[in-house]
Amino acid sequence: MSDIQLNTLKPAEGAKHAKRRVGRGIGSGLGKTAGRGHKGQKSRSGGFHKVGFEGGQMPLQRRLPKRGFTPLGQHLYAEVRLSDLQALPVDEIDVQTLKAAGVVGQAVRYAKVIKSGELSRKVTLKGLTATAGARAAIEAAGGSLA
């Protein structure tokens, strides 16, 4: 192992290839047509179809029906787990606290606590809603929803 040194490292034989230099004379083997063949759309500069083009046939993206939509207010609502509340260092929790801790995004206006994970300490929720199971878990730990 002592033979290997940083200044003696070389790539394996055949691992490196010279860059193809096309259109640089007959002797290179890639002169004249530069590997593009003769005539036709693909031989010309800028000559290629757009993505999804199927030669005039109705493209798949237009053959299939439109489906579904994204609700405009989707980013306004967020779900928060009990385990997320357990990890927070504060006892009074509202949407601003959740944003500051990075639990929910900055665009969120309303958050709902769901029963996922464990809560073993007393927390007070302000301006948040909760599922029935989450509410029971919060109250069992001595917490409340204001």
UniProtKB/Swiss-Prot annotation:
Record-level GO cellular component terms: cytosolic large ribosomal subunit
Keywords (A to Z) from UniProt: Ribonucleoprotein, Ribosomal protein, RNA-binding, rRNA-binding
Biological process terms in GO annotation: translation
Pfam family, one: Ribosomal_L27A
A single MF term (Gene Ontology): structural constituent of ribosome
Residues covered by region (Disordered): 1-65
Transmembrane intervals: none
Lineage: superkingdom: Bacteria
InterPro entries, A to Z: Ribosomal_uL15 (IPR030878), Ribosomal_uL15/eL18 (IPR021131), Ribosomal_uL15/eL18_sf (IPR036227), Ribosomal_uL15_bac-type (IPR005749)
RNA-binding among keywords: yes
Residue stretches of biased makeup (Gly residues): 24-34
Protein task: Binds to the 23S rRNA.
Subunit structure of this chain's protein: Part of the 50S ribosomal subunit.
Family membership: Belongs to the universal ribosomal protein uL15 family.
Name the UniProt record assigns to this protein: Large ribosomal subunit protein uL15
Origin species: Bordetella petrii (strain ATCC BAA-461 / DSM 12804 / CCUG 43448)
Upper lineage: Bacteria, Pseudomonadati, Pseudomonadota, Betaproteobacteria, Burkholderiales
